[in-house]
């Protein structure tokens, strides 16, 4: 995979992220119209910067380092990127209008326990973690993969706690 093709891949992931934001904005309006309450918003700007940085870091590291594509690493990582997208959109589809990039709970709606949520409490974050190390490693951007993984671990610790608190308070 050449640097150009890798750039196309990163561009496709960026387009997918923009599609997520369109869905999230639509779902946010739906949720707020039904009394939804947003919480955990203090960490959201950091999340946006971190995820944008992942994409920029992938491109910058690969283009500036001039690393060659290593098929034995690149193709398995590419498969993980694809699988992470499948899992992410399975989550989006399962949650329907309740899916969002923000933490928004609509009072009275039941906790979703189907789809991937019957297997894991936060499957979307599994997709984020896998994509966060796999996308850079498709073309050997190990520094980007490492930095994103460490920063994302801290972010997810805050995010999962905020999400669990929001869900708990909605059931009380």
Region locations from a protein language model:
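N-terminal signal-anchor/start-transfer transmembrane helix
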Residues: 10-25
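Feature marks short, highly hydrophobic, charge-poor N-terminal signal-anchor/signal peptide-like helices
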Residues: 1-5
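Membrane-embedded alpha-helical segments that form the functional core of polytopic membrane enzymes
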Residues: 6-11, 79-83
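Cytosolic-biased juxtamembrane loops and peripheral soluble domains of multi-pass membrane proteins
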Residues: 22-43, 69-172
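Long, highly hydrophobic alpha-helical transmembrane signal-anchor segments
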Residues: 42-73
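Alpha-helical hydrophobic membrane-insertion segments
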Residues: 8-11, 60, 154
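Alpha-helical transmembrane segments of integral membrane proteins, especially early/N-terminal helices
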Residues: 7-11, 38-47
């Amino acid at each position: 995979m050449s640097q150009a093709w890798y750039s196309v891949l990163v561009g496709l992931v960026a387009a997918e992220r923009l599609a997520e934001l369109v869905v999230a904005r639509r779902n946010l309006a739906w949720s707020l119209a039904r009394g939804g309450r947003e919480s955990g918003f203090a960490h959201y700007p950091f999340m946006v910067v971190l995820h944008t940085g992942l994409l920029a870091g992938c491109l910058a590291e690969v283009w500036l380092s001039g690393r060659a594509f290593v098929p034995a690493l690149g193709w398995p990582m590419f498969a993980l990127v694809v699988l992470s997208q499948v899992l992410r959109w399975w989550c989006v589809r399962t949650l329907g209008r309740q899916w969002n990039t923000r933490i928004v709970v609509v009072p009275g709606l039941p906790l979703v326990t189907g789809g991937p949520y019957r297997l894991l409490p936060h499957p979307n974050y599994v997709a984020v973690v896998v994509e966060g190390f796999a996308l850079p490693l498709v073309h050997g951007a190990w520094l980007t993969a490492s930095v994103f993984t460490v920063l994302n671990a801290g972010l997810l610790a805050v995010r999962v706690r905020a999400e669990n608190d929001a869900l708990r308070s909605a059931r009380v």
